[in-house]
Amino acid sequence: MRDYKLVVLGAGGVGKSCLTVQFVQGVYLDTYDPTIEDSYRKTIEIDNKVFDLEILDTAGIAQFTAMRELYIKSGMGFLLVYSVTDRQSLEELMELREQVLRIKDSDRVPMVLIGNKADLINERVISVEEGIEVSSKWGRVPFYETSALLRSNVDEVFVDLVRQIIRNEMESVAVKDARNQSQQFSKIESPSTRLPSSAKQDTKQSNNKQSSKGLYNKSSQGQAKVKQSTPVNEKHKPSHAVPKSGSSNRTGISATSQQKKKKKNASTCTIL
């Protein structure tokens, strides 16, 4: 079972205590008693999961402002309440929200905007459209109009806030897991191994030996190829190669002259 700490914030007299007591105890408070700080606990089941809620009902903005920062630091989700019969209470929420974001140092703080006392139709000075407009300016923060007297949307605002907290936790866990996986993958792809100085010198010497050995092998292979190529060219020397100038030309001329002399001798013999 998870424990969530919720904080109810707003100006004095907007009905924060009535809203909280109606949710926790199912009772409507018909008398106004300025709250210094009240803490309530309630166990609730949401989406088949059980949660233990600690709800802190705080004083109005004008009272005990020094304690408000402690409330905000410890809170996990915030219900910002104004009264539809009091315009100033909505204006004070603007500053209060900025304070929450500054202390939490985040723009993604679980939060619900609540216009309470919606049952006082004749005393209303803030329309539903104005509440929706403020919600849009705040980044579409969930907006509800409630009535503690009629128990209208009372459970819904607390359930919505708890679901926001759950969603934020799941997203933060997913981001953390993705970051860890990327770090592990980078370690596998590019392992960083540092060698001592002596090992580095040994590796350099072995690399130099291998490189010189490779050059020697290449040169010896080249010489072997040259030695083999010489007899092959002589063996397969073409028959119609042009002879060199010199003695070979002379031998060719003497052979033809001897053939002519033989023919003359043969002819003279037949005449006799």
From Swiss-Prot:
GO MF terms, alphabetically ordered: G protein activity; GDP binding; GTP binding; GTPase activity
The record's section on PROSITE patterns has: RAS
A GO BP annotation: establishment of protein localization
Entry keyword set? Cell cycle, Cell division, Cell membrane, GTP-binding, Hydrolase, Lipoprotein, Membrane, Methylation, Nucleotide-binding, Prenylation
Q: Show the ranges annotated as biased composition (Polar residues).
A: 180-232, 245-258
Span list, region Disordered: 177-272
Q: Any known activators or inhibitors? A: Alternates between an inactive form bound to GDP and an active form bound to GTP. Activated by a guanine nucleotide-exchange factor (GEF) and inactivated by a GTPase-activating protein (GAP).
Using the record's annotations, give every residue carrying the modification Cysteine methyl ester: C269
> Where is the short sequence motif Effector region located?
32-40
Q: What Enzyme Commission number does this protein have?
A: 3.6.5.2
Q: Where is the lipid attached (S-geranylgeranyl cysteine)?
A: C269
Q: Where in the cell is it found?
A: Cell membrane
Q: What is the effect of changing G12V?
A: Loss of GAP-induced GTPase activity
Q: Which Pfam families match?
A: Ras
Main location, first listed in the record = membrane
Listed under catalytic activity are: GTP + H2O = GDP + phosphate + H(+)
Q: Which GO terms describe its cellular component?
A: cell division site; cell periphery; cellular bud neck; endoplasmic reticulum; incipient cellular bud site; plasma membrane; site of polarized growth; vacuolar membrane
Organism superkingdom: Eukaryota
Q: Which residues bind GTP?
A: 10-17, 57-61, 116-119
Residue numbers covered by the propeptide annotation in the UniProt entry? 270-272
Membrane topology label = Lipid-anchor
Q: Which family does the record assign?
A: Belongs to the small GTPase superfamily. Ras family.
**What is this protein's function?**
Ras-related protein which binds GDP/GTP and possesses intrinsic GTPase activity. Involved in development of cell polarity during the cell division cycle, and essential for bud emergence.
Recorded hits in NCBIfam families, A to Z, give:
small_GTP (TIGR00231)
Protein name from the UniProt record: Ras-related protein RSR1
Question: Which organism is this entry from?
Answer: Saccharomyces cerevisiae (strain ATCC 204508 / S288c) (Baker's yeast)
